[in-house]
A protein has these predicted regions:
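Charged, amphipathic alpha-helical linker segments immediately N-terminal to NTP-binding catalytic cores
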Residues: 1-16
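ATP-dependent carboxylate-amine ligase catalytic core
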Residues: 6, 22, 26-37, 63-150, ...
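N-terminal pre-Walker A segment at the start of P-loop NTPase domains
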Residues: 12-26
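Nucleotide phosphate-binding/pyrophosphate-handling subdomain across enzymes
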Residues: 38, 127, 132-135, 143-156, ...
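A conserved segment at the C-terminal end of the G1
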Residues: 40-44, 52-69
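Short internal beta-strands
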Residues: 71, 188-193, 301-304, 324-331
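Conserved catalytic-core segment of NTP-binding enzymes
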Residues: 142-143, 151-206
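C-terminal helical cap/extension that packs against the catalytic core
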Residues: 193-210, 225, 271-272, 312-365
């Protein structure tokens, strides 16, 4: 099996099929000897900011000399982006090898795409003897496939807001409860969110509850944006709690190396910002960043999103009458149509069809979904 065949097999499982629950992945991992039990974890959940927190933590641990496994989702360009060891993606050869090997063993268990990837990740990291895994949840926490782990060094919970409400609940308290499912016995939970449920579940599990305030000095952090204050505070609190001997010099050196593509990322050659903000809270953070860093720029937006998102709220938050607005319908069965987007937009808009003259002095902002970025980047 080669890489393309592995991807084809994965997508045949239903690329956007989501079935929360731990029974299937538990049976699959048992057949492989439960490789997840051989590893140590920092487990990260939350609505927004998970990827940035994971990137900061893993980079600091790498700088301190550890062999660090990093598991994130979704990917932008290739599946291999999701599984990394010390900043290096799993090779396409290894990815195909593990997909082929594992799916033959568990072929009678109807795993989702995300569950297969999670099983591959556990087996790969165990085989490579990583020192620690920085583990990002896929959706929610309590019944997310990553929560098959029995213990963690600590749980980290980032900002909580409305997203995936059809699965996680319609109130912030319900969503927080689902995220709190990653809190394990005799461990710790580090969060910037003061929900009582976090402390209650921590107490029930004899685990430390640590509430941290935003860390304001992000001047050395390679990631841009006001919202990174909160992400940095969580990452640094986690490092200082678990690894107090990591020096300030190592931390500052690592912060300058952190990479997390398409998070308020500025592409100078095109005077363009690319941001995977894909829910109302993420769009609000993007809007705040644009108002703060580029208050007087003539802005041109390219926006597309999935139909399970509150795109009406995102559109109302983001756009102003003076903006140029372009909508993009990408190749995804759940992509919102141009007509649907235009129906809720209070301002004139057009369909994005071809690249612009990027020397015209306008700031182009691309946002709305992870899933359109690979396709759209080829047209920019």
């Amino acid at each position: 099996m080669n890489y393309n065949e592995a991807v084809k097999l994965l997508t045949s499982q239903g690329k956007f099929r989501i079935e929360l629950g731990l029974d299937r992945i538990s049976r699959a991992l048992e057949r492989l000897g439960n490789p997840q039990d051989k590893l140590q974890y920092i487990h990260v959940a939350g609505t927004n900011g998970k990827g940035s927190v994971c990137a900061i933590i893993s980079t600091i641990l790498q700088e301190a000399g550890m062999k660090v496994g990093l598991y994130t989702s979704p990917h932008i360009f290739e599946y291999t982006e999701r599984i990394m060891i010390s900043g290096v993606e799993i090779t396409k050869f290894d990815f195909a090898f593990y997909i082929d090997k594992i799916t033959k063993i568990i072929e009678d268990i109807n795993l989702t795409e995300f569950e297969i990837l999670t099983v591959v990740m556990f087996k790969y990291f165990a085989d490579k003897n990583v020192d620690i895994v920085v583990l990002e949840t896929g959706l929610g926490g309590r019944f997310d496939a990553t929560n098959i782990i029995k213990s963690n060094l600590c749980a980290v919970i980032t900002h909580i807001d409305y997203d995936h409400t059809e699965r996680l609940g319609n109130t912030l308290s319900q969503i927080a409860f689902e995220k709190a499912g990653i809190i394990k016995p005799n461990s710790a939970v580090i969060t910037s969110e003061g929900y009582e449920i976090f402390k209650d579940i921590a107490d029930e599990n004899n685990s430390l509850f640590m509430l941290v305030a935003p860390f304001e000095d992000t001047s050395n952090l390679a990631l841009n944006g006001l919202h990174q204050q909160q992400n940095l505070s969580l990452a640094l609190a986690t490092i200082k709690y678990l690894f107090p001997k990591i020096s300030p010099v190592q931390i500052q050196k690592a912060l300058k190396k952190v990479k997390n593509p398409f998070r308020f990322e500025f592409i100078e050659s095109k005077n363009m910002i690319v941001d995977v903000a894909h829910n109302p809270n993420g769009i609000m953070a993007l809007k705040n960043n644009l108002d703060y860093y580029y208050p007087n720029e003539h802005k041109r937006f390219i926006f597309g999103c999935l139909n399970n998102k509150d795109y009406a709220s995102m559109i109302y938050q983001l756009f102003e009458a003076k903006d140029e607005i372009y909508f993009y319908h990408f190749n995804n069965p759940n992509s919102v149509t141009i007509d649907e987007l235009q129906d809720v937009c209070p301002y004139p808009s057009k369909e994005f069809k071809e690249k612009f003259d990027y020397t015209d002095g306008k700031l182009t902002i691309v946002c709305g979904s992870f899933y359109m970025m690979k396709e759209l980047c080829s047209k920019l």
